[in-house]
Amino acid sequence: MKNLVRVVSCVLLVAMLSVAVFADSFTASVTQKDAPAVTKTAEVVAADGSKVEVKASDIKVESVAAKSIAPEAKAELDKAYDVIVKAGSLEKAVPELKTVLKEAKIDVPVANLVVRDLVNVSVPEDVVKALETEGTTITVSFKLDVKEGTTVVVMRFVDGKWVPLALENVTVNKDGSVDVKLDGVGPIAFLVENK
């Protein structure tokens, strides 16, 4: 009986510690809510300045909570999620966040940021190929319903690690949407200040 109590106690302790790590790095709903919609036509800009539009309906955004997501995308999202959880905090998972905030003169400690949305972004194959060319970007507008003036940090999961975007590539609009200039697609995390 004592051994059973010890085992149950250990399981409960591990569960409580996992919840604490989760609570520090993610909003409670990140694994339960739908992905934000794309609000308008996206624009691909090549290094030479040429532009191509991509219809919003051709951009697929799927949340970590999505039920019908391609197995490869789900595996990559799960891996991206686990990197933050296993590190124990955003500061440990993405040390570059501090530098990004400092360069943008944003006075928000990394410890105060949480992931509010974790999604996979996919585009048609011709756009994927275009983004492989150095200097080519796509600007996508996501319906996040955040207030103008809110600090929104965006990270992209690249080669097994999170890479924060320079804040000059993220624009919060008056309508609550957020324009993000990306140099690739795949898992994307939106971070906001935990208030």
Language model segments and positions:
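Sec-dependent N-terminal signal peptides of Gram-positive bacterial secreted proteins and lipoproteins
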Residues: K2-D24
